[in-house]
Amino acid sequence: MDVTRLLLATLLVFLCFFTAYSHPPPEEKLRDDRSLRSNSSVNLLDFPSVSIVALNKNSKQISRKEAEKKRSSKKEASMKKVARPRTPLSAPCVATRDSCKPPAPACCDPCASCQCRFFRSACSCRVLSLNC
């Protein structure tokens, strides 16, 4: 009984290897020179043509100036963000990054919320979004 199972298992493994290695990948099937030439010409026609243009010094300087303007405008835009007035802090509140277990009062920061981990054993006030 054990010999027949061993023989069947060996036969099954041999058949698996035979079927896996008997089929070559598609790129290995084409070994003929004619098929390689026709295949390569088809591949070259599939891709769009590329044109190479030489840049002179003026165009490089203009692009640098434009890049610097974009950088400065982005910095100015980030600086122009108006800070909204904070709400007055109520006395019973929890500061950011302090413990805020459920019987504790709410977080002081209006953008913060109480996040609990490890089955509500470790809770702390955290700011979730920076754009709040």
UniProtKB/Swiss-Prot annotation:
Glycans are attached at residue 39. The presence of a 'disulfide through disulfide knot' structurally defines this protein as a knottin. Residues 93-132 form the Agouti domain. PROSITE patterns: AGOUTI_1, AGOUTI_2. Its main location: secreted. This is Agouti-signaling protein. It comes from the Eukaryota. Keywords: Disulfide bond, Glycoprotein, Knottin, Secreted, Signal. Pfam families: Agouti. It comes from Macaca nemestrina (Pig-tailed macaque). Disulfide bonds join 93-108, 100-114, 107-125, 111-132, 116-123. Involved in the regulation of melanogenesis. The binding of ASP to MC1R precludes alpha-MSH initiated signaling and thus blocks production of cAMP, leading to a down-regulation of eumelanogenesis (brown/black pigment) and thus increasing synthesis of pheomelanin (yellow/red pigment). GO terms for biological process: hormone-mediated signaling pathway; melanin biosynthetic process; melanosome organization. Residues 61-87 are annotated as: Disordered. Residues 63-79 have a biased composition (Basic and acidic residues). GO terms for cellular component: extracellular space. Residues 1-22 form the signal peptide. GO terms for molecular function: melanocortin receptor binding; neuropeptide hormone activity. It is found in: Secreted.
